[in-house]
């Protein structure tokens, strides 16, 4: 009988023979070829570093696939025979000498790809071999972080073991994409897999713990047991089959009950041990015997102590209460209030306050109140002066040619002010009407009273009308959704930003004298176009960041008012977000345009040069046609904007009246037949479009079809490049794949043939019927109806 030679556990397979035929130094070359076909990183690389490269098969593949004039460096502990276009040297990748040699060869270049296919000398023990290989991978990763370019690729071989997941976690911190794969040329019996890391993040600093094997592969300590959960929630306890504890193989723990009484952590004992024992030791224990004879130690307590693992929350609580009672009897518990029980209570006698002292305190309180009032008024006056000085510096004085010179600096009317009347104490006199008595006839008084009554009646009727109209509007909104949408649009358009509101909150009194000093600012020279340093500091506050430059708001005095209220600052936060961009744009603008009109409208053009205008009404279409044909000019349209309805006074009018008037109080624009037809055609085209869901469904269908075709194309390319298959097998496999992509024929419907006339009692296929068919008759129809009727009755 012939002796069958063993080929090293199947090492001499087809990849071994192909490597011999192709001239590769090892069968591992096909692993890199298959990885490159899947990820395509060699063609994009100009600098490659191969760690643990002996005998050099990966360097051979890299020299074939990479562009010419590429730099390929291979390093290993074992010597590597020379390879064309490859720089090789012998060194240990964990030493500083290897780093210096690589740096010398690369000079100022960075590696686009780093390969690592190394493994330690195996054969001692699988656990030790796996850890050594994981440690070697981490060392190669450390070397790759020094020489890899940002966005580079790192390919390494890893053994599947308990250290695989920590390695993968480290890779994911340093790379954007991490994938583990096993190429077909890798033997199935081998525990090796290849991890392809793409998109190196290139951080400026890497924590040394990331690349320290002691830290990365450290075993996590078990967390402390949660004894409270075992005691107070025993029904929620889940079994964890983690084996036995070290040195404890019986899983039964017993402890004397005296230790449970004396311990400071009874919950830990109840959660850890199985039994609290009352049994006496050979020498005897007096405390244990006393515990057993106590009145509190009932049979229920003894039964609960026999097996702690089967107890519930109620039994655990009774054991804890029993422990407290026993500790009180033995004197182990000291009550908190016991030490202070014998001490006499100190009673503080409060002497009655003297009458003179009470008067002095009242006077002092009134003086402080008056002082605070004066401080508040002084602060307001200083603030008003400071605002006036800033207005003068910014040339924002009130124009004298429109009759507003009588207004005060704060915008108050100087001719009459209620504040001044209140300060003089004459408000009550004016309100009472006793300033001047005028004789009047009794008839005039009667007439005035009648007028007052009629005015009250009119106000009441107006209020009733308003309330009835509101109820009518609410009923319309409940019935019609279009009315609700119209009201929502109206409310949204009516919203306006009211600016900053004054606040009555008082500031701290520590800034009493600061207001007057801050108000003294040197006046700016008349020719200077910039603010003074004080005003610039004032307008650098956060509250003015969203209001633009000073030149843009010269005519808007109210927009410059500084407010001290926190709520107003929150309202202005929406404007503050846009302030940096606007300030940056204005800083880059040339000085020639600083005096331009701030109200100049923005250019409505898009980036492609087309106007951002959509004509949706027949009136607008007719107007556009007139402008396009030259019948009307822009000045004519501006003139048409001034009509009898432009300045219609609507102040004080009720809402129901305005809603009715707005239907008719507007100019009637002429509409041409061509404009109406154009708008109708436009709406027809819009309505002809499918709805959004249908368009999305069609888009998804097209996208999935394209994805399937791309997938089939890649599979067919892989089959075409497979050297192990013959041409016939390749063509059959590709044809089979492409047949799946062909659109399936619609399912043929079953044709119903009524069994009457020539088809009554027929046994075969009816004449003239092709495809699937089913013969039906009136009896079958009645039976189906009866079945449906019975099923409905059962419900």
UniProtKB/Swiss-Prot annotation:
GO cellular component, one term: preribosome, large subunit precursor
Basic and acidic residues: compositionally biased ranges: 379-390, 460-483, 565-582
Listed InterPro entries: RNA_methyltr_RlmE, RNA_MeTrfase_FtsJ_dom, rRNA-MeTfrase_E, rRNA_MeTfrase_SPB1-like_C, rRNA_MeTfrase_Spb1_DUF3381, SAM-dependent_MTases_sf, SPB1-like
Residues binding S-adenosyl-L-methionine, per UniProt: 56, 58, 76, 92, 117
Predominant location: nucleus
GO molecular function, a single term: rRNA (guanosine-2'-O-)-methyltransferase activity
Annotated EC: 2.1.1.-
Residue numbers spanned by region Disordered: 367-416, 430-534, 549-613
Catalytic site: 157
Compositional bias ranges of the Acidic residues kind: 438-459, 493-515, 549-564, 592-602
GO biological process, one term: maturation of LSU-rRNA from tricistronic rRNA transcript (SSU-rRNA, 5.8S rRNA, LSU-rRNA)
Catalysed reactions, semicolon-separated: a ribonucleotide in rRNA + S-adenosyl-L-methionine = a 2'-O-methylribonucleotide in rRNA + S-adenosyl-L-homocysteine + H(+)
Pfam assignment, any one: Spb1_C
Stated role: Required for proper assembly of pre-ribosomal particles during the biogenesis of the 60S ribosomal subunit.
Entry similarity comment: Belongs to the class I-like SAM-binding methyltransferase superfamily. RNA methyltransferase RlmE family. SPB1 subfamily.
PANTHER family registered for this protein in UniProt: PRE-RRNA 2'-O-RIBOSE RNA METHYLTRANSFERASE FTSJ3, RIBOSOMAL RNA METHYLTRANSFERASE
Subunit-level organization: Component of the nucleolar and nucleoplasmic pre-60S ribosomal particle.
Protein name, UniProt field: AdoMet-dependent rRNA methyltransferase spb1
Organism whose genome encodes this protein: Aspergillus fumigatus (strain ATCC MYA-4609 / CBS 101355 / FGSC A1100 / Af293) (Neosartorya fumigata)
């Amino acid at each position: 009988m012939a002796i069958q030679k063993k080929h090293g556990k199947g090492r001499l397979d087809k990849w071994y023979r192909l490597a011999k035929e192709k001239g590769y130094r090892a069968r591992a070359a096909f692993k890199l070829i298959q990885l490159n076909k899947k990820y395509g990183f060699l063609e994009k690389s100009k600098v490659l570093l191969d760690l643990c490269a002996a005998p050099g098969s990966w360097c051979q593949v890299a020299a074939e696939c990479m562009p010419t004039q590429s730099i390929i460096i291979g390093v290993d502990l074992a010597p590597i025979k020379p390879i064309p276009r490859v720089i090789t040297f012998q060194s240990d990748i964990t030493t500083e000498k290897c780093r210096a040699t690589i740096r010398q060869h690369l000079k100022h270049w960075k590696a686009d790809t780093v390969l690592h296919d190394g493994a330690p000398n195996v054969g001692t023990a699988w656990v030790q071999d796996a850890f050594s290989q994981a440690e070697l991978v981490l060392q190669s990763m450390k070397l790759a972080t020094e020489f890899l370019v940002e966005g580079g690729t790192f390919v390494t071989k890893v053994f599947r073991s308990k250290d695989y997941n920590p390695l993968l976690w480290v890779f994911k911190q340093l790379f954007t994409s991490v994938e583990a794969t096993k190429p077909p040329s890798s033997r199935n019996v081998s525990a090796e897999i290849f991890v392809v890391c793409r998109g190196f993040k290139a951080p400026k600093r890497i924590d040394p713990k990331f690349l320290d094997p002691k830290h990365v592969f450290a075993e996590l300590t078990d967390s402390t047991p949660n004894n409270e959960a075992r005691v107070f929630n025993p029904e929620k306890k889940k079994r964890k089959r983690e084996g036995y504890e070290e040195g404890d193989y019986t899983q039964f723990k017993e402890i004397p009950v005296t230790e449970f009484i004396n311990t400071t952590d009874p919950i830990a004992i109840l959660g850890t041990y199985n039994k609290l024992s009352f049994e006496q030791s050979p020498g005897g224990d007096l405390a244990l015997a006393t515990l057993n004879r106590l009145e509190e130690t009932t049979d229920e307590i003894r039964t609960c102590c026999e097996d702690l693992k089967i107890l519930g929350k109620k039994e655990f609580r009774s054991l804890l209460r029993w422990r407290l009672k026993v500790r009180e009897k033995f004197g182990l518990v000291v009550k908190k209030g016991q030490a202070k029980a014998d001490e006499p209570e100190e009673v503080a006698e409060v002497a009655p306050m003297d009458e003179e002292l009470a008067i002095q305190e009242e006077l002092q309180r009134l003086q402080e109140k008056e002082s605070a009032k004066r401080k508040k008024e002084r602060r307001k006056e200083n603030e008003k002066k400071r605002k006036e000085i800033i207005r003068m510096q910014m040339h924002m004085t009130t124009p004298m040619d429109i009759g507003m010179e009588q207004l005060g600096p704060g915008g108050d009317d100087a001719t009459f002010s209620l504040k001044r009347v209140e300060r003089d104490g004459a408000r009550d006199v004016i309100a009472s009407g006793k300033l001047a008595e005028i004789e009047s006839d009794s008839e005039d008084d009667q007439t005035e009273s009648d007028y007052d009554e009629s005015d009250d009646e009119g106000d009441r009727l107006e209020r009733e009308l308003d309330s009835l109209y509101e109820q009518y509007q609410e009923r319309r909104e409940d019935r019609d959704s279009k009315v609700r949408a119209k009201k929502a649009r109206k409310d949204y358009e009516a919203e306006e930003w009211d600016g900053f509101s004054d606040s009555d909150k008082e500031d701290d009194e520590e800034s009493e004298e600061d207001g007057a000093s801050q108000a003294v600012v040197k006046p700016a020279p008349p020719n200077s176009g910039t603010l003074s340093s004080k005003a610039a500091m004032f307008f650098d506050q956060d509250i003015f960041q969203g209001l633009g430059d000073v030149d843009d708001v010269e005519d808007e005095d109210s927009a410059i008012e500084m407010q001290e209220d926190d709520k107003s600052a929150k309202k202005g936060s929406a404007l503050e977000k846009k302030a940096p961009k606007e300030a940056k744009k204005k800083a880059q603008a040339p000085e020639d345009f600083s005096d331009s009109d701030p109200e100049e409208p923005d250019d409505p053009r898009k980036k492609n040069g087309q106007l951002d205008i959509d004509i949706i009404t027949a009136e607008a279409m007719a107007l556009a046609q007139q402008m396009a044909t030259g019948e009307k000019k822009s000045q004519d349209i501006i003139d048409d904007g001034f009509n009898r309805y432009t300045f219609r006074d609507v102040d004080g009018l009720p809402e129901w009246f305005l809603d009715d008037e707005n239907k008719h109080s507007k100019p009637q624009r002429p509409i041409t037949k061509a404009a109406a037809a154009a708008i109708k055609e436009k709406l027809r085209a819009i309505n002809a479009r499918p709805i959004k869901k249908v368009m999305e469904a069609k888009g998804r269908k097209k996208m999935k079809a394209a994805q399937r075709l791309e997938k089939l194309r890649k599979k067919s390319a892989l089959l075409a490049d497979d050297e192990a298959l013959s041409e016939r097998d390749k063509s059959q496999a590709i044809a089979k794949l492409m047949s799946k992509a062909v659109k399936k024929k619609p399912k043929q419907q079953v044709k119903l043939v009524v069994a009457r006339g020539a088809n009554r009692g027929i046994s075969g296929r009816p004449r003239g019927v092709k495809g699937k068919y089913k013969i039906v008759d009136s009896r079958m129809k009645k039976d189906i109806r009866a079945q449906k009727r019975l099923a409905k009755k059962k419900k």
